């Protein structure tokens, strides 16, 4: 859905909820747990329930598939004319702290030239600069995440002093309570409008904003004219959608949160939230570089307790650690908050001191509304010498700038206005006040019309061919005496623009509702792609003779007429209820013909200062951006300088050059490189130490192809640095060591330090744990064993009665929070992964010790004969033993980290292919052995990352430059090199974000198998299939089909049997993930395969475009077309309802779509003609879209699911042949064998 920076609306066509049923919402483990089962106003609840687990498994990288970010265009802001007055700059002239300013503008905008069209305004309150760069999201490294329990109320933490009088007076006066009338944002057709470059500082008659509080950080923000980035959308399909208490799209304000986790990143927070959304989820996260919206703000989230959830938008501030990053994060939050307030017709009004308003902190909700006991974000803001009052002042200023009430930063303002001889020109058009409201209707554009309007302020509309078609209407706008409708595609939500009221035939519409009803319908009746469709929107006609069965699944009322959506004889569409009479029966849905995307052939070029590495798979080098094809290049996986970027149509290019010389390499497509921002190099004079063996590179951020040498000698060597450059967030230095010169990451340079022994006992004993009485929730690092006899576990310290805690007894858990309540002290226990809170225990029920900080180590030990075994957790009990002492005695233990527990030290590592903790007292360090390292050798294979708790490394066996694999867990890793160091095999390859790294072989797997319970027995599902009206088919005699019996079906559906067969197992291969095979290899597969020969590019495009495994597409096409030789694949035409094979224009169908058994050639060609598949490549790409939308992306993402649909047996099944999945599985397995690969992801249903 296009977001608020284009057309924001309350989820058009998706369902306006009737009433405001009281719902309860899940909250943190530290708060009272609510029951969700009574919620009745959830959208598509049955669909969400069915697809949640599948979607959840696929969403691991939080921003991997962002469908574009949008730029907001505000029609209400018009450049005013001003008199020739004395002017000043609108930046607030107050003292600013002398902090270092980050040179990156971190904006996602590029300049365009000679822009005479209405200009889109950025979400930032300042004019955008040209040549700005974006931090590469692929290098956002995810660290371990903390639990979601936030700060809780400390009565001493937040003083209840009255708000300063001036602050209170102005804010309340300037921001009365929101009314229903608003001035929301009205926007462009494009999902990414381009801001124009600013040649000169404009003048304005608007006054300068007068800050109400002193704030050096806010002054820094104003002085440096900080811009907010574009909002990224990272929505998750399985999050529930509930209306606010006043309805969809009607929040009452916004709540400020912080994540309460100093170690996490924005990606880590989002990933954790997606995996634990049942406890809490919020609308957005903000840090110093990005704003990521994770849930539609038209619907509530679970972030502030059961009282506040139905009222407010919840936004989390991710912790940053330096002055500039914190300032950017405050600027980003204020801009996002002001945008939300403006959009929803709300005005800034602080609720902090009276419990009434539109801007809240979590603390204020706890204090005035209840349902939660958190106190954020005050503690975090105070740690940066900032306050909520300063943030609110910035939000208010941003809002007033957006509303055109005060001068934007960077503009000039009138200080001494001259007396005008005639009235000054108003800053708003004279056409009158703008009001915008949500709408839920439909409209047809008349043949004679004024065109489509980008904004309602446009003087003329653009001509359109979209006439006499039914569109959804999502908003109405009134400007002066003129009324407009915002129209969009009914099925996709794509916006067309604003149309005048007089240019359309409009009807009211109720929200669609799900139904399950069968009707009879006369043959020849037309079906439409939309309700109240026109002759231009016919989806097909009912085939057959006499009455046919129409299975309805959806109903919508348009004006006073009822329309139903359903299927009949393989065709789906909408039909008026007037043409239907009650009865029953269903079938699959073809999709409408894809619309032709618009293109923009305007060229924009701007200077750039970055670096890039060309991917191994690329489209080549382009001499000019107008070239249709690029020239092959061997300059891959090397770092080059980037001097320019260009946009032409839908393509973006970088101009790359040799880093050390002026030699230009050529233009490359954006998708063919890994790009990073780069600051200009600066001269330095600094001496460091560097370890021998450290690689030097000829360029900063160099690859293995650009090694300049390695540091020689033994022990630390002296590195004299003469130059420094920042690449993305990393610092690289150029210098000389032992006669060799080159670049090296600063991470490898340090001041000499004495080494520490891995198992050394702490010299100073850790203080024994003593019970304290904190006045609020404190963050602690402790570890506890639950006593066998305990009083139980609580979801909140306020619960009077605890739940039975027997299952936690005699086990060890991490302690992350501590809180006093009355005369008792409670601690929050977390599971062994540190991430998920379990609940609160009274400290009297625990044995507690202090837990030190984990320290990385790399050492091998021998396990003593007498030992306590390998445990799941340090200081684990007998109930948490992974391997007993006898199983690991005198074995080799490979330690990777250590931690102190009280006076003891525990080490974490691997033994007998299992990982866990061992007490240091149970280990003996072996005598030193000279390390062995083999030379890296070429090795090409794609693995799956299986250990999200593992790491990837810049260099193998490094203790410093390593980063968490959590964000890449269960994703492919394309290996190009292999190296063995000290018996450990390492692989060098490419992560899913394009970054090259080293990973241990123990963190990788050749395949990933998941098992899912169906909840039914094999006999039950086989009985359903065998009892269908249209029986499953089997060939007992070649060429002769007969009905399959119960035993045939049961045998074919037995997943235990199939999973044991190395070929038949491939019917469980997940088909919703491409294999990323090169076009050349695909073409080798297709040699001699009829019309499919040399169609590798089409299969590759189809796989990437629709997220489908290309090996499956190929095998499916070969099976359906007889290796590309069938007439259906070779093509024909249907003229006067007869097949013509010698026509000039032929239509092709390579997947047998709609080729029904009674007349497969005619029906298949008719469908291909309707879809416009007049080439084989179009048939491949278009057919893949049908396969993806109707099966693979509908939850049936394996051959087994497509054939048997175990989630809903007997419905929506692709074939009738009981061997269909077996045949395709064998073919797919054969192709994998030919390329020396194996399937990566398997999903196997299990029956009771």
UniProtKB/Swiss-Prot annotation:
Region (Endo-beta-N-acetylglucosaminidase): 768-1248
Region (Disordered): 103-134
Keywords: Cell wall biogenesis/degradation, Hydrolase, Multifunctional enzyme, Repeat, Secreted, Signal
Short name of any one Pfam family annotated for the protein: GW
Post-translational modification: Undergoes proteolytic processing to generate the two extracellular lytic enzymes, probably at the septal region on the cell surface.
GO terms for cellular component: extracellular region
Biological processes annotated in GO: cell wall organization; peptidoglycan catabolic process
EC supergroup of this enzyme: hydrolase
Major site of localization recorded for this protein: secreted
PROSITE patterns cross-referenced by the UniProt entry: GW
Any one Gene Ontology molecular-function term assigned to this protein's record: amidase activity
Subcellular location: Secreted
Region described as N-acetylmuramoyl-L-alanine amidase: 191-767
Known EC number: 3.5.1.28, 3.2.1.96
Catalytic activities: Hydrolyzes the link between N-acetylmuramoyl residues and L-amino acid residues in certain cell-wall glycopeptides; an N(4)-(oligosaccharide-(1->3)-[oligosaccharide-(1->6)]-beta-D-Man-(1->4)-beta-D-GlcNAc-(1->4)-alpha-D-GlcNAc)-L-asparaginyl-[protein] + H2O = an oligosaccharide-(1->3)-[oligosaccharide-(1->6)]-beta-D-Man-(1->4)-D-GlcNAc + N(4)-(N-acetyl-beta-D-glucosaminyl)-L-asparaginyl-[protein]
Signal peptide as annotated in the record: 1-29
The GW domain, residue ranges: 435-509, 511-585, 604-678, 680-754, 776-851, 853-928, 935-1009
Subunit structure, interactors included: Oligomer; forms a ring structure at the cell surface which is important for efficient partitioning of daughter cells after cell division.
Function (record text): Endohydrolysis of the di-N-acetylchitobiosyl unit in high-mannose glycopeptides and glycoproteins containing the -[(Man)5(GlcNAc)2]-Asn structure. One N-acetyl-D-glucosamine residue remains attached to the protein; the rest of the oligosaccharide is released intact. Cleaves the peptidoglycan connecting the daughter cells at the end of the cell division cycle, resulting in the separation of the two newly divided cells. Acts as an autolysin in penicillin-induced lysis.
Domain notes from UniProt: The GW domains are responsible for directing the proteins to the septal region.
Similarity field: In the N-terminal section; belongs to the N-acetylmuramoyl-L-alanine amidase 2 family. In the C-terminal section; belongs to the glycosyl hydrolase 73 family.
Descriptive protein name: Bifunctional autolysin
Organism: Staphylococcus aureus (strain Mu50 / ATCC 700699)
Upper classification of the organism: Bacteria, Bacillati, Bacillota, Bacilli, Bacillales
Gene responsible for this protein: atl
């Amino acid at each position: 859905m296009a977001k608020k920076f284009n057309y924001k609306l309350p989820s058009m066509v998706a369902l306006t909820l009737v009433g405001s049923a009281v719902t309860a919402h899940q909250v943190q483990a530290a708060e009272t747990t609510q029951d969700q089962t009574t919620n009745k106003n959830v959208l598509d609840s049955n669909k969400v329930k069915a697809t949640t687990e599948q979607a959840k498994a696929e969403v691991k990288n939080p921003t991997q598939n962002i469908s574009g970010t949008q730029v907001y265009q505000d029609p209400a802001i018009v450049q005013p004319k001003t008199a020739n007055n004395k002017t000043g700059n609108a930046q607030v002239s107050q003292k600013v702290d002398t902090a270092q300013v980050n040179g990156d503008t971190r904006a996602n905008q590029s300049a365009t030239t000679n822009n005479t069209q209405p200009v889109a305004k950025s979400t930032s309150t300042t004019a955008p600069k040209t040549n700005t760069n974006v931090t590469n999201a692929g290098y956002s490294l995810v660290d371990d995440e903390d639990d979601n329990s936030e700060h809780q109320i400390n009565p001493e933490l937040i003083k209840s002093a009255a708000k300063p009088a001036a602050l209170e007076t102005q804010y309340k006066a300037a921001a009365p309570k929101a009314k229903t009338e608003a001035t929301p944002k009205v926007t462009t057709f494009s999902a990414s409008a381009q801001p124009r470059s600013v040649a000169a500082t404009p003048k304005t008659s608007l006054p300068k904003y007068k800050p109400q509080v002193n704030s050096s950080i806010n002054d820094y923000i104003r002085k440096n004219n900080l811009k907010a980035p574009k909002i990224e959308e990272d929505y998750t399909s399985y999050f529930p959608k509930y209306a606010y208490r006043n309805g969809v799209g009607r929040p009452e304000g916004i709540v400020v949160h912080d994540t309460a986790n100093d170690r996490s990143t924005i990606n880590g927070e989002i990933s954790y939230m997606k995996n634990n959304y049942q406890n809490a989820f919020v609308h957005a996260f903000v840090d110093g570089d990005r704003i990521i919206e994770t849930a539609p703000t038209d619907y509530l989230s679970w972030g502030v307790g059961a009282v506040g959830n139905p009222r407010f938008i919840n936004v989390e501030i991710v912790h940053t650690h330096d002055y500039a990053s914190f300032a950017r994060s405050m600027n980003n939050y204020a801009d996002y908050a002001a945008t939300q307030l403006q959009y929803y017709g709300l005005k800034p009004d602080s609720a902090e001191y009276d419990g009434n308003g539109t801007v809240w902190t979590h603390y204020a909700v706890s204090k005035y509304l209840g349902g939660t006991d958190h106190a954020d974000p005050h503690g975090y803001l105070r740690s940066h010498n900032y306050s909520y009052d300063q943030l609110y002042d910035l939000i208010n200023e941003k809002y007033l700038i957006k509303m055109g009430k005060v001068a934007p930063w960077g503009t000039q303002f009138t200080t001494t206005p001259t007396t005008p001889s005639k009235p000054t020109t108003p800053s708003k058009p004279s056409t009158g006040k703008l009001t915008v409201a949500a709408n839920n209707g439909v409209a047809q554009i008349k043949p004679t019309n004024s065109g489509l309007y980008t904004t309602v302020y446009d003087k003329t509309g653009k001509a359109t061919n979209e006439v006499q078609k039914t569109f959804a209407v999502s908003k109405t706008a009134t400007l002066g005496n003129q009324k407009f409708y915002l129209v969009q595609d009914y099925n996709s939500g794509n916006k067309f623009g604003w149309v005048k009221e007089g240019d359309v035939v409009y009807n009211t519409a109720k929200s669609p509702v799900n139904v399950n009803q069968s009707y009879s319908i006369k043959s020849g009746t037309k079906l439409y792609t939309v309700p109240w469709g026109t002759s231009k929107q016919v989806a097909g006609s009912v085939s057959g003779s006499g009455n046919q069965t129409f299975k309805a699944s959806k109903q919508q009322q348009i004006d006073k007429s009822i329309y139903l959506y359903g299927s009949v004889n393989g065709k789906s569409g909408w039909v008026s209820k007037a043409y239907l009479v009650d009865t029953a029966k269903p079938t699959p849905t073809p999709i409408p013909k894809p619309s032709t995307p618009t293109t923009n052939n305007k060229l924009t070029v701007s200077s750039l200062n970055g670096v890039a590495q060309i991917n191994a798979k690329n489209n080549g080098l382009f001499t000019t951006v107008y070239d249709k094809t690029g020239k092959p290049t061997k300059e891959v996986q090397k770092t080059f300088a980037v001097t320019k970027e260009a946009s032409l149509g839908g393509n973006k290019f970088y101009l790359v050059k040799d880093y050390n010389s002026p030699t230009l390499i050529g233009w490359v497509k954006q998708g063919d490189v890994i790009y990073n921002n780069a600051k200009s190099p600066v001269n330095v004079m600094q001496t460091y130490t560097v370890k021998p063996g450290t690689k030097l590179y000829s360029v900063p951020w160099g690859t293995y192809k650009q090694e300049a040498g390695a540091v020689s000698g033994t022990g630390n060597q002296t590195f004299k640095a003469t130059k420094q450059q920042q690449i993305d967030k990393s610092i690289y230095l150029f210098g000389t060591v032992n006669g060799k010169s080159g670049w090296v990451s600063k991470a490898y340079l340090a001041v000499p330090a004495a080494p520490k022994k891995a198992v050394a006992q702490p010299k100073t004993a850790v203080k024994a744990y003593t019970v304290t009485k904190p006045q609020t929730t404190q963050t602690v690092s402790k570890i506890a064993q639950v006593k066998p006899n305990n009083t139980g576990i609580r979801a909140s310290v306020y619960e009077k009665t605890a739940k039975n805690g027997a299952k936690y007894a005699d086990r060890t858990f991490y302690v992350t929070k501590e809180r006093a309540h009355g005369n008792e002290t409670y601690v929050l226990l977390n599971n062994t992964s540190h991430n998920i809170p379990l609940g609160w225990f009274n400290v009297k029920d625990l044995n507690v010790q202090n837990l030190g900080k984990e320290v990385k180590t790399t050492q091998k030990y021998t396990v003593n004969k007498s030992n306590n075994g390998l445990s799941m957790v340090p200081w684990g009990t007998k109930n948490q033993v992974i391997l007993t002492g006898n199983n690991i005695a005198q074995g080799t233990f490979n330690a990777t980290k250590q931690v102190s527990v009280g006076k003891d030290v525990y080490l974490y590592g691997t033994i007998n292919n299992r990982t866990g903790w061992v007490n240091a007292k149970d280990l003996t360090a072996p005598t030193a052995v000279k390390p062995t390292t083999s030379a890296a050798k070429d090795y090409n294979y794609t693995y799956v990352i299986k250990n999200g708790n593992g790491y990837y490394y810049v260099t193998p066996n490094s203790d410093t430059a390593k980063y968490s694999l959590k964000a890449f867990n269960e994703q492919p890793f394309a290996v190009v090199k292999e190296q063995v160091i000290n018996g450990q095999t390492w692989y060098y390859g490419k992560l899913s974000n394009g970054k090259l790294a080293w990973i241990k072989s123990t963190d990788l797997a050749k395949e990933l198998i998941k098992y899912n319970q169906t909840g039914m027995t094999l006999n039950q599902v086989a009985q359903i299939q065998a009892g269908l009206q249209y029986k499953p088919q089997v060939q007992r005699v070649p060429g002769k089909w007969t009905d399959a019996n119960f035993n045939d079906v049961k045998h074919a559906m037995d997943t235990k049997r199939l999973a044991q067969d190395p070929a038949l197992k491939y019917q469980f291969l997940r088909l919703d993930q491409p294999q990323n095979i090169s076009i050349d290899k695909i073409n080798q597969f297709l040699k001699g395969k009829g019309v499919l020969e040399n169609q590798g590019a089409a299969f590759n495009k189809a796989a990437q475009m629709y997220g489908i495994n290309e090996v499956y597409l190929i095998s499916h096409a070969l099976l359906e077309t007889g290796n590309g030789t069938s007439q259906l694949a070779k093509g024909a035409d249907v003229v006067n309802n007869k097949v013509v094979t010698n026509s000039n224009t032929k239509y092709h169908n390579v997947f047998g779509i709609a080729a029904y058994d009674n007349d497969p050639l005619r029906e298949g060609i008719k469908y291909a003609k309707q879809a416009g598949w007049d080439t084989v490549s179009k048939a491949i790409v278009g057919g893949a879209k049908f396969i993806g939308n109707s099966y693979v992306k509908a939850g049936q993402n394996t051959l087994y699911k497509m054939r048997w649909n175990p989630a809903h047996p007997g419905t929506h099944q692709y074939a009738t042949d009981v061997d269909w999945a077996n045949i395709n599985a064998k073919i797919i397995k054969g192709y994998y064998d030919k390329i020396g690969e194996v399937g990566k992801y398997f999903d196997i249903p299990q029956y009771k």
